[in-house]
Amino acid sequence: MFEENNSPTTDNSLWTLQGRQRASPAQRLHNLTSAGSSTSSSGLPLPQNIFTNPAIQPSSVINLNHSTDVVIGPMTQYQGPVSIYYMDYMEAHAMQTAAGINSNNANGNGNANRSRDKSPSRRVTRNTILLITLILLVLATGLIVLYVELNRPKPELPSNKAIYFGNNYDHQTFPNLGNGHLVVDREQWGASKNSHGLTIPLKRPIPYVLITHIGVQSLPCDNIYKCSIKMRTIQDSAIAEKGLPDIQSNFYVSEEGNIYVGRGWDWANTYANQTLAITFMGDYGRFKPGPKQLEGVQFLLAHAVANRNIDVDYKLVAQNQTKVTRSPGAYVYQEIRNWPHFYGCGMDEAPACGIELGMKTESWDAKQ
């Protein structure tokens, strides 16, 4: 309650507020209903200008001692039922976070729906661009390949003439026989460097051509790779097992009709000095010679005649006409006996082969 100060002055601003006990609810209601009169809790009248006089500064003259439930300043009072909810910081933060997540989910779902609405058209556009790019790359590649193929120099096709060489042929650079019959030199099929020096030269033109085969169940070879291996095997066997200085024959003919150089034009073969030995690569007691193989031998003979390596009237004989052997095989023998230069020496009552040259039986098995 308010009490008047004992100071002799009567200034209305010198009032002090002393502590009082907490009023009961009934007393508070009575105070509210009697708000029309300005009295203190003790029934003493308050000065009328205590709240309206600007000269009065209660903050400088009011002392609070052992008081409770004191309000200084404006206060709002509610009459009627009021519901007050208390929410601590954690609950408020959780609700705000949940609201944010829901908002984000709503935005995300909206964006996803919009993306799903737009993604098919984007996917179609992307696939179309990729397809067009791929087609353009394929077309460009095809055009480049076509251009390269059209501008690649074409190899000269061999002629189908019987003889393909002029008189200026150099035997040290053996040419292609034409018509697909290649000549594979010693360096090309990988001749061994361990061969011993050959000492018996061939005198040209050569009067006899001797036809042999490899035999011993040898399979015909049909490409340069396989035939080159076979040539090296024959040479190794001749040097290591038979004690010969080099491979036996002058030339070898494969199934595809290619010519492989053995001792060549300059050196005598291992059979007889005055002969040019041509060997069919395979066992022709078991296999038939192919048409390209037979043609390759004929082309080689035509080339040799044109260049005077063999006599114009050369005599063609099979090895079994000169000694007891199955070479060159029954199938080859059936073919060559019908060739124009075949010579039937050593058969039935015919004279021995080479007798006109002074050759004896031993001359056809020189092993040199």
Curated annotation (Swiss-Prot):
Gene Ontology CC entries for this record: plasma membrane
Sites of glycosylation? 273, 320
Q: Which domain of life is it from?
A: Eukaryota
Database matches in SMART domains: PGRP
Which regions face the Extracellular side of the membrane? 149-368
This chain's function reads:
Peptidoglycan-recognition protein probably involved in innate immunity by binding to peptidoglycans (PGN) of bacteria and activating the immune response.
This protein is called Peptidoglycan-recognition protein LA
Organism per entry: Drosophila melanogaster (Fruit fly)
Its encoding gene is what? PGRP-LA
